[in-house]
A protein has these predicted regions:
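Membrane-interface junctions at transmembrane-helix termini in multi-pass inner-membrane proteins
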Residues: 65, 70, 117-141
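Membrane-interface helix-capping segments at transmembrane helix termini in multi-pass transporters
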Residues: 32-43, 68-79, 90-118, 158-165
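Signature of the first transmembrane helix
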Residues: 2-59, 148-149, 169, 173, ...
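Alpha-helical transmembrane segments of multi-pass membrane proteins
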Residues: 49-53, 97, 102-128, 204-207
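Membrane-embedded alpha-helical segments of multi-pass transporters/permeases
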Residues: 22, 26, 53-56, 92-100, ...
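Membrane-interface helix-loop junctions in multi-pass transport and translocation proteins
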Residues: 29-37, 101-109, 132-135, 142, ...
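Membrane-water interface segments that mark the loop-to-transmembrane alpha-helix transition
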Residues: 6-17, 43, 48-99
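Interhelical loop/hinge segments that connect adjacent transmembrane helices in multipass membrane
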Residues: 3, 135-138, 162-164, 169, ...
Length: 213
């Protein structure tokens, strides 16, 4: 029964992911020119490479470890998340240097998209996936995405709202990640960053990352 419920939650979310762009795309393309959307797409593609560095293979590895060691969730979580946080800080530092020293990156869209890196650094959905709590993940993602779409229709009105549009996309993504930390506290307790335990997880994370990529 639990497997069927998890499948239903995941299926409903995937349907939402398909439907929402169908709703927003005509509206967005009517407001912004192909050049504006191309600018967003270009910088977003660059940020994606830094996100890959920030996340490593943590999502896959973290899910596996949490699922396999449910009696020691707190220790495993903070060891893995410490690794994720270090990778995110490194990635964000490199992205900042790129924006500062490469003229082609000195664009407000590129700056705003830096929030996406921070957002991925806060992502702990792998904890709930390991616990097989797909209901919470689906509810969180659905709520945030719907609010994001509503905000676009409410606030994005003219071609001059491109920066606002990009900000809303990244802001609600970040809000969604932050919203998972409160329910996570019952499993992970207070923050406990553990460099020694993070080193233990480093090699398997890199191995999984190389296989996945």
């Amino acid at each position: 029964m639990k497997v069927l419920k998890n499948y239903a939650y995941n299926l409903s979310y995937q349907l939402l992911v398909i439907v929402l762009p169908i709703i927003t795309t005509p509206y967005v393309t009517r407001i912004f020119s192909s050049k504006d959307l191309g600018t967003y797409g270009y910088f977003n593609s660059i940020v994606t490479y830094f996100i890959l560095l920030a996340t490593l293979g943590v999502a896959n590895y973290g899910t596996k470890e949490i699922s396999a060691h449910r009696k020691d969730i707190r220790k495993n979580f903070w060891g893995i998340y410490t690794l994720q946080l270090i990778a995110t800080i490194l990635s964000l530092a490199l992205y900042t240097l790129l924006c500062l020293f490469f003229p082609g990156m000195q664009n407000m869209v590129a700056y705003i998209l830096g929030l996406s890196l921070i957002s991925k650094g806060m992502d702990i959905s792998w904890l709930f996936q390991g616990l097989e709590d797909f209901r919470r993940i689906t509810a969180r993602n659905t709520t945030v995405k719907v609010l994001g779409v509503i905000s676009i229709f409410l606030f994005v009105k003219t071609p001059g709202d491109l920066y606002l549009y990009v900000f809303l996309l990244t802001f609600f993504e970040l809000l969604g990640q932050l919203s998972m930390w409160l329910p996570a506290r019952s499993y992970i307790g207070d923050p406990h960053f553990d460099l020694s335990y993070a080193r233990i997880h480093l090699k398997p994370v890199i191995l999984i990352s190389s296989v996945v990529n």
